[in-house]
Amino acid sequence: TGIKAKFVFMDMFLQDNLSDLVRNMGFSDEDIIWLYSYFTDLKIAPTTYTVKDLEKEIPYDITRREINGKVVKLFCTKEDIFYAAYLRKEGEDIVHRVEKVSRGCLIRKDFYSYTKMFTEYYTPVDNKAHLYQRRFFNEDGSIAYDEIVDGKDSVFRFPDKILSSKQEFIAYFM
């Protein structure tokens, strides 16, 4: 008794905020360690990023808005870009992730909690979006580390270290 348990999650969570998931399972944010945020100074926390926050960050004129269920699309016609904001719940203003599509091609996904947690970068290959990099951030927006993705293989690049596989990444965590 008296020993505080921590639960370590080692998978990527792309569809939902980890805080929302673990709270639904009865855990508190403080009980959780996420492998990918462990090397940042971010806390496990609910999403508070809003569509208005996104609108302030878009450097182009937003010429059209579409709302379809949990997705809000913001179009910048002159630049041939649109942003698809995926809401935590339909009818809310809280954004879990944003996809940036340029000239019909997905080029970036940004994932949020109380700040931007990480970004995925894509390039078109055979008319499909191909993930080639994830960048993980600290609270102040500085880069904590990068994951360079090549299919199922990854290389993790830290300011002072390069880890050549997910196994090395997990071993470094341990």
Protein language model features and the residues they cover:
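Long terminal segments
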Residues: 1-46, 53-55, 131-174
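Repetitive, compositionally biased segments used for assembly/scaffolding
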Residues: 56-167
